């Protein structure tokens, strides 16, 4: 597989290089040189296969012979060890639930596949993953790499600034997972990570990798669950399918569009955002004008400069698609709350991100169309806000309940690079 840097097309790398490097020069994103396409008969055959077999074929179409098919299938089986069911919400609407993995969020798919790829590519060479988190990413990375050989994971998070449930999810693992509560905010944690990657001696000594969410391996993994969704739909729904994607950094939408590029039958996509509406405004008037980021109920989408957007534009350019065909909607917190109650009234418990995707879908769905919206996180991950909005108590899923009483294993450090460096070098 060949990929090129969107900021410098002369920089071309293999799949293995893109996975280990993460980003290209000038923080450029990598994009596939070749965009494979399946014939209609191939799509029909793919949709009859099981999740792992189908996903292996999809990933193999991109990765090529860089990873032998048998090995790839083995790694896919290890990564995608949980379902992605479509739950019927209304006669013409379903939710693709992506929260049945170990950390109850869609990031489990990309995180676990990236972990499998990185450990294969690194072989026996020790790797240290260093990343900062405000919650979800840390949990997905921790569980994805937990127990893998020759990998040490160090996760920084702002002390006292993530929910107790989130903290329990990834700070109770131990083993090869080290968590560090930093006396500062998320920006302070990110600054420490940046300093570590600027330290050539530390980088070389520990084999540092960031496991960043824009890693190409995570993006390719996400394509697979769009096919899994369509495979569960009756033929009449497949013919008139509209997909609504809750969008923050736009990785999920990019993956869906790549699935369409492969030949998956999707009539149109909708980019659903909260009040951080840079993309909806751009699609409306053609002006890219990010505002200051606003805090909302759907905090995972509080992004005003989505870093995957250049990949969306590149795909539309390469496929000669029109951006004007991409649906969009920006949903306020008040409408999000009302929509969560509306969904509850038809028997479906949702959280803010999925509710936004549903609202954008419901408001634009035409007669005869079938709508699918993405459920990216388990409602219990937003227990406090969901309970307050719906006026009822949510039971804790076992993934959260079984960790609730475990002791936290985190180190505590000031927001000081020398202290972090010492910890990493003495334990490395």
What annotation goes with each model-predicted range?
Residues 1-428:
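PLP-dependent amino-acid enzyme catalytic core
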């Amino acid at each position: 597989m060949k990929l090129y840097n969107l900021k410098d097309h002369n920089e071309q790398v293999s799949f293995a290089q893109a996975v280990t490097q993460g980003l290209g020069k000038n923080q450029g994103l990598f994009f596939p040189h070749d965009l494979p396409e399946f014939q209609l008969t191939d799509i029909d055959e793919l949709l009859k296969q099981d999740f792992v077999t189908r996903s292996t074929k999809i990933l193999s179409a991109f990765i090529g012979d860089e990873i032998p098919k048998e090995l790839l299938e083995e790694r896919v089986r290890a990564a995608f060890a949980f379902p992605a069911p479509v739950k019927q919400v209304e006669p013409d609407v379903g939710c693709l639930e992506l929260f049945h993995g170990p950390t109850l969020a869609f990031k489990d798919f990309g995180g676990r596949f990236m972990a499998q790829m990185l450990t294969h590519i690194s072989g026996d060479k020790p790797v240290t993953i260093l990343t900062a988190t405000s919650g979800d990413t840390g949990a997905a990375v921790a569980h994805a790499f937990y127990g893998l050989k020759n990998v040490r994971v160090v996760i920084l998070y702002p002390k006292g600034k993530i929910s107790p449930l989130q903290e329990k999810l990834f700070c109770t693992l131990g083993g090869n997972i080290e968590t560090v509560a930093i006396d500062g905010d998320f920006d302070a944690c990110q600054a420490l990570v940046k300093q570590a990657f600027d330290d050539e001696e530390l980088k070389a000594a520990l084999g540092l990798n960031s496991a960043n969410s824009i890693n190409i391996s995570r993006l390719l993994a996400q394509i697979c669950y769009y096919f899994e969704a369509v495979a569960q739909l009756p033929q009449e729904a497949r013919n008139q399918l509209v997909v609504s994607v809750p969008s923050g950094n736009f990785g999920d939408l990019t993956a869906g569009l790549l699935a369409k590029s492969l030949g998956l039958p999707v009539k149109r996509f909708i980019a659903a955002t909260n009040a951080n509406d840079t993309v909806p405004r751009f699609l409306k008037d053609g002006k890219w004008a990010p505002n200051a980021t606003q805090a909302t109920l759907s905090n995972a989408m509080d992004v005003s400069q989505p870093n995957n957007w250049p990949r969306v534009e590149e795909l539309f350019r390469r496929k000669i698609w029109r951006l004007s065909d991409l649906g969009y909607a920006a949903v306020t917190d008040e409408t999000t709350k009302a929509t969560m109650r509306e969904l509850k009234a038809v028997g479906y418990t949702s959280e803010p991100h999925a509710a936004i995707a549903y609202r954008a879908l419901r408001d634009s769905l035409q007669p005869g169309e079938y709508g699918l919206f993405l459920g990216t996180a388990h409602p219990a991950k937003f227990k406090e806000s969901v309970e307050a909005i719906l006026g009822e108590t949510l039971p804790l899923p076992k993934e959260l309940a079984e960790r609730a009483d475990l002791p936290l294993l985190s180190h505590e450090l000031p927001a000081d690079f020398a202290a972090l460096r010492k910890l990493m070098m003495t334990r490395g």
